[in-house]
């Protein structure tokens, strides 16, 4: 198994969308997966694109990916990367591919002068939790993740300041 890892290019977007749908199914979140090639292109390659990514290839087959974007810790005053997704297809798990992707993301962050990588893991995904802890990640047990989406976002955005 000779796996190469490189930056995602525009020609990879259909593969990334396919892998994202697989990932959503794995995480039991398929009903929320609305990504399209066009949306991904806008986020990654348009003039105001802000998402970066890596793809792992076994020959001509995309077998894993990672997506990330800039973030900022206000209390620490530090810029970092937010690891939005890292996903490895089932047949390629347990072959150090996750570790290779994570190391490459850390190198990218370091080369940009960034000092942290933040991410979330679903509570039930024990293999992922163990993976990140094994590599030295800190678990912030006292935090809860919230979001405004759909009607709640629209309502909030239409209220006067």
Which residues fall in each region the model found?
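A short helix-loop-beta-strand connector motif used in the catalytic cores of GNAT acetyltransferases and
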Residues: 43-55
């Amino acid at each position: 198994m000779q796996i190469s890892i490189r930056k995602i290019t525009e020609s990879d977007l259909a593969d990334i969308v396919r892998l994202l749908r697989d990932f959503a199914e794995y995480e039991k979140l398929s009903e929320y997966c609305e990504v399209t090639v066009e949306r991904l292109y806008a986020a990654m390659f348009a003039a105001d694109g802000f998402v970066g990514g890596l793809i792992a290839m076994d020959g001509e087959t995309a077998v894993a990916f990672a997506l990330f974007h800039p973030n900022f810790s206000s209390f620490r005053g530090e810029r970092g990367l937010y690891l939005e997704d890292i996903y490895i297809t089932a047949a390629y798990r347990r072959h150090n591919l996750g570790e290779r992707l994570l190391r490459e993301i850390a190198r990218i962050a370091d080369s940009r002068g960034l000092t942290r990588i933040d991410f979330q893991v679903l509570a039930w995904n024990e293999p992922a939790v163990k993976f990140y802890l094994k590599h030295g990640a800190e678990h912030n047990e006292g935090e809860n993740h919230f979001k405004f989406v759909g009607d709640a976002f629209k309502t909030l955005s239409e209220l006067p300041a």
